From Swiss-Prot:
It comes from the Eukaryota. The gene is SPC25. Residues 19-139 form a coiled coil. One of its GO terms (cellular component) is Ndc80 complex. Its main location: nucleus. Component of the NDC80 complex, which consists of NDC80, NUF2, SPC24 and SPC25. Belongs to the SPC25 family. PANTHER family: KINETOCHORE PROTEIN SPC25, KINETOCHORE PROTEIN SPC25-RELATED. CDD domains: RWD_Spc25. Keywords: Cell cycle, Cell division, Centromere, Chromosome, Coiled coil, Kinetochore, Mitosis, Nucleus. This is Probable kinetochore protein SPC25. InterPro entries: Spc25, Spc25_C.
């Protein structure tokens, strides 16, 4: 083989090698493009995933902030309710303490009243016994007084009748020689601060009544007043 043939063969071999290299380069370029494309897709996907994750985290953060705000408001509301409940509890406690004090005061008052009632019952019982004893003594004394009164009336010619708590009637007899049983009466009101003559029988003059009534209220001597009235009735019989 001559030189030209060897050169041509070498050229052909080089062309074949170039073509093979070109094919490899093309394949490498395609593979590189695919890798770049895949890499870009992966980067884009990661970027989207990252954005989505950031967005999700942002949303979660917003929701958590809302929840935190809501919890804070609930916490404040709960604290306010607790403070109000505590104040109410303190007020109720104070009221309960006041009621306990009032109850104790009532118990003490009740005990004092019961003690006073017992003392009063004892005093009433003692007073009742003394009153019964006094009534018995009074009844006995009244019986004696009736006897003495009858003697007194016969001796003095005067009967005393109590008509009410305010009126007393004094009746004189043994004044009229023609009729010793004839009665002469004067009714005296003793209910006020001063005595007043309500009526006389037989009737004395108004001037005479005013005169003896004035003397009675001035001197306050009933016995002297009765003596003067007896004298007036006796003079009345003589005239």
């Amino acid at each position: 083989m001559d030189t030209a043939e060897r050169a041509y063969e070498k050229f052909q071999n080089q062309m074949i090698a170039f073509d093979n290299l070109k094919i490899e380069m093309n394949e490498l370029a395609v593979d590189l493009d695919q890798q770049l494309s895949d890499k870009q897709s992966l980067i884009l996907q990661q970027e989207q995933d990252h954005k989505q994750k950031v967005n999700d985290l942002t949303n979660q953060e917003y929701k958590l902030k809302l929840q935190a705000k809501s919890l804070k408001e609930k916490e404040n509301a709960t604290r306010d309710k607790l403070n109000l409940a505590m104040r109410s509890l303190e007020q109720q406690k104070s009221k309960v303490e006041d009621l306990v004090k009032k109850k104790q005061s009532l118990v003490d008052t009740k005990q004092d009243l019961e003690s006073q009632i017992k003392q009063l019952e004892t005093a009433i019982d003692q007073g009742t016994r003394e009153l019964n004893k006094s009534n018995d003594n009074m009844s006995l004394q009244m019986n004696k007084n009736l006897v003495e009164l009858n003697k007194y009336e016969i001796y003095t010619g005067l009967k005393i009748e109590v008509q009410s708590n305010e009126l007393m009637c004094f009746k004189f007899f043994n004044l009229d020689p023609n009729d010793y049983d004839r009665e002469f009466a004067i009714t005296l009101n003793i209910g006020g601060s001063t005595y007043s003559i309500e009526n006389t029988s037989p009737k004395l003059s108004d001037e005479t009544v005013e005169q003896i009534q004035g003397k009675l209220n001035q001197g306050r001597q009933l016995s002297k007043f009765l003596k003067e009235v007896r004298t007036l009735f006796k003079d009345f019989v003589q005239y």
